[in-house]
Amino acid sequence: MERLLVLARHGQSEWNLKNLFTGWRDPDLTEVGIAEARAAGRRLKAKGIRFDICFTSALTRAQRTAALILEELGQPDLPTIADEALNERDYGDLSGLNKDDARARWGKDQVHIWRRSYDVPPPGGESLKDTVARVLPYTMREILPRVMRGERVLVAAHGNSLRALVMVLDGLTTETIPGLELWTGVPLVYRLKADTTVESKEVLDKDA
C-alpha cells in the first residue's frame, strides 16, 4: 500500500517580493508565484502523482497554490480542506514590516533571533515552537491517519508550518530546524512505512 504525503510551500507572494514579514496577513501570489505553483503541479504530474485529498491553510497564497497544482494535475475538483492550524507562523508586531526596517528598529541580532531561534517569539507573535505546537496535533489527528490508510495527500502551506512537519518526518532537532530552507513552489514527496517512518523522500526542484 502506498502511503504518499506531498508537502508544498506556496509560490512567491506579493509580500515575499516586497521583503515584508507576512505571517497571518493575506497577500496573494505574484505572477512568479503563480508560475511556481503551476510548475510544481507539472513536476508532480511528470512523476505520475495524483491525490485523493488536499489540505491547506486559511490563507489565500496557500489555497491558490493548492488550486493551481491540482489544476495542472487535472484534479481541480479534488476535496480540499482549509484550516488555520496550517497557517504560517504569526509574526505579531513584525507583520507587515519590511525586514530591513525591522532590523533598523530592533537591531539585526534581535530580528535574527526572532526569525531563526526555535522558542523566542517576536512581540505579540509565535515562536517556531508555538507553530509546531499548533500544526502537529492537527496533522496527527487529521492528516497522518489518512496517509496511513493509503490516501494520497497533498499539503500546501507555508515555510514555518511545513517546517513543523519536516522536523518530525526527517527527525531534525530543535537546533537545526529553524535554519531549514523550504523553497517556494518546490514539492517534497514523502513515502511512509507502516510504522510512519520515512521510506523515501524526493525534492522535486527545477531539475527533477
Swiss-Prot record:
Question: What InterPro entries does its record include?
Answer: His_Pase_superF_clade-1, His_PPase_superfam, PG/BPGM_mutase_AS, Phosphogly_mut1
- Pathway the protein takes part in: Carbohydrate degradation; glycolysis; pyruvate from D-glyceraldehyde 3-phosphate: step 3/5
Q: Supply the enzyme class, top level.
A: isomerase
* Swiss-Prot/TrEMBL catalytic activity: (2R)-2-phosphoglycerate = (2R)-3-phosphoglycerate
Tell me the Gene Ontology biological-process terms attached to this UniProt entry: gluconeogenesis; glycolytic process
Q: Recorded GO terms, molecular function?
A: phosphoglycerate mutase activity
Q: Enumerate the active-site residues.
A: H10 (tele-phosphohistidine intermediate), E88 (proton donor/acceptor)
Q: Which domain of life is it from?
A: Bacteria
The UniProt entry, under Gene3D superfamilies, shows: Phosphoglycerate mutase-like
User: Which residues does the record give as substrate binding sites?
Assistant: 9-16, 22-23, 61, 88-91, 99, 115-116, 159-160
Q: Which protein family is it in?
A: Belongs to the phosphoglycerate mutase family. BPG-dependent PGAM subfamily.
> What PANTHER family does the database record attribute to this sequence?
PHOSPHOGLYCERATE MUTASE
The record's function comment reads:
Catalyzes the interconversion of 2-phosphoglycerate and 3-phosphoglycerate.
Q: What is this protein called?
A: 2,3-bisphosphoglycerate-dependent phosphoglycerate mutase
UniProt source species = Methylobacterium sp. (strain 4-46)
The organism's lineage? Bacteria, Pseudomonadati, Pseudomonadota, Alphaproteobacteria, Hyphomicrobiales
**What gene name is given for the protein in this entry?**
gpmA
